[in-house]
């Protein structure tokens, strides 16, 4: 938020054109230097409307983030029906990392477009409307303008397409057509952005990579560091989403793999392992990866719904809320 005055001073066009250059990049906060310009632009737009103050900015961020409830419910409903959709929202609303970090970081607003693009993707799988594929590309474009973590969604779609080729050849052809249109839409967005503002996304990515490596290292300096960092990434995220939810998600995913090879959770499992061991992230993933919420809560909700055991559901919800409260206390006191 401290970078908003800089954008206000130089103007949007100059800010985008010179984002990766020294006169802008070196003036940014360390956090902004590891992100694309969308986050600062997002806050700048709302500061123009409501003024430059932390209270209105926090409220806008929370309200904007809360809209993810809609695509999460619609995604769960599209895949598994209304009952799973409702249960997914209940589990989502008590997910520790999302509750804690939505009001304390920009990763909440960053999660909106990746989650929306995921819903649109699965909606397009059962539809012939090309406009859905175009919207997927636009959502990914906006998501990538706010956080580089949106690359995870692109990788997930790729893994889904590969598994579709293996297990559902008919669906594969439709997925490829959808992703091709989405890719064209994505490229067109950044092509037009470059044409009108001279913003070079490749320069911005490279500058952010070098900034991150300077502070955190590459992650593969030694085999020991690589393995410990990658394993810690995975564990930090799975603990952050809530141990009870993680167990339910894991049981649900394994059940789907042993059964009909449901591609929604199985594609996520493969993608999660790849990203966790990619060294693209050096911890804090319990915050950065909160956009992965639907991939956890929806399979967990489906598993609990199929068990049809109220005692199990109450146990998962109670223990997750307990973990949330403990995390809140530790975050605001000990940590």
Task: Put a short name on every predicted segment.
Residues 117-132, 304:
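Membrane-interface transmembrane helices that cradle and orient dolichyl/undecaprenyl
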Residues 55-79, 114-116, 120:
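Transmembrane-helix motifs of polytopic, lipid-linked glycan transferases
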Residues 97, 102-110, 285-286:
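Short acidic/glycine- and proline-prone juxtamembrane loop motifs at membrane-interface regions
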Residues 130, 182-187, 307-334:
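Signature aromatic-anchored transmembrane alpha helix within multi-pass, membrane-resident enzymes
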Residues 238-260, 265, 269-276, 298:
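Hydrophobic, aromatic-rich transmembrane alpha-helices
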Residues 159-253:
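Membrane-lumen/periplasm interface segments of specific transmembrane helices
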Residues 100, 132-159:
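Membrane-interface alpha helices of multi-pass inner-membrane proteins
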Residues 25-51, 143:
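Short hydrophobic/aromatic helix or loop-helix immediately within or flanking a transmembrane segment
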């Amino acid at each position: 938020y401290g970078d908003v005055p800089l954008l206000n001073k130089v103007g949007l066009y100059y800010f985008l054109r010179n984002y990766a250059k020294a006169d802008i990049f070196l003036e940014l906060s360390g956090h902004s230097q590891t992100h694309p310009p969308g986050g600062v632009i997002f806050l700048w737009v709302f500061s123009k409307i409501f003024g430059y103050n932390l209270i209105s900015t926090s409220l806008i961020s929370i309200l904007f983030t809360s809209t993810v409830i809609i695509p999460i419910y619609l995604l769960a409903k599209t895949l598994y029906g209304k009952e799973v959709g409702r249960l997914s929202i209940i589990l989502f609303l008590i997910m520790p990392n999302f509750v804690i970090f939505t009001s304390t970081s920009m990763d909440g607003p960053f999660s909106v477009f990746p989650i929306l693009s995921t819903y649109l993707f699965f909606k397009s799988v059962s539809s012939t409307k090309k406009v859905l594929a175009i919207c997927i590309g636009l959502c990914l474009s906006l998501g990538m303008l706010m956080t580089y973590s949106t690359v995870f969604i692109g990788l997930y779609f790729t893994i889904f397409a590969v598994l579709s080729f293996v297990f559902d050849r008919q669906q594969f052809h439709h997925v490829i057509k959808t992703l091709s249109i989405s890719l064209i839409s994505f490229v067109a967005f950044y092509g037009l952005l470059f044409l009108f503002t001279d913003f070079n996304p490749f320069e911005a990515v490279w500058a952010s990579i070098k900034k991150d490596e300077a502070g955190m290292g590459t992650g593969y300096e030694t085999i020991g560091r690589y393995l410990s960092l990658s394993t810690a990434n995975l564990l930090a995220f799975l603990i952050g989403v809530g141990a009870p939810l993680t167990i339910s998600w894991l049981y649900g995913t394994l059940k789907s793999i042993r059964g009909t090879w449901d591609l929604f959770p199985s594609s996520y499992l493969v993608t999660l392992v790849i990203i966790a061991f990619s060294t693209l992230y050096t911890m804090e993933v319990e915050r950065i990866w909160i956009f992965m919420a639907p991939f956890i809560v929806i399979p967990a909700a489906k598993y609990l719904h199929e068990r049809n055991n109220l005692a199990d559901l109450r146990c998962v919800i109670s223990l997750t809320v307990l973990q949330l409260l403990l995390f809140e206390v530790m975050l605001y006191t000990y940590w």
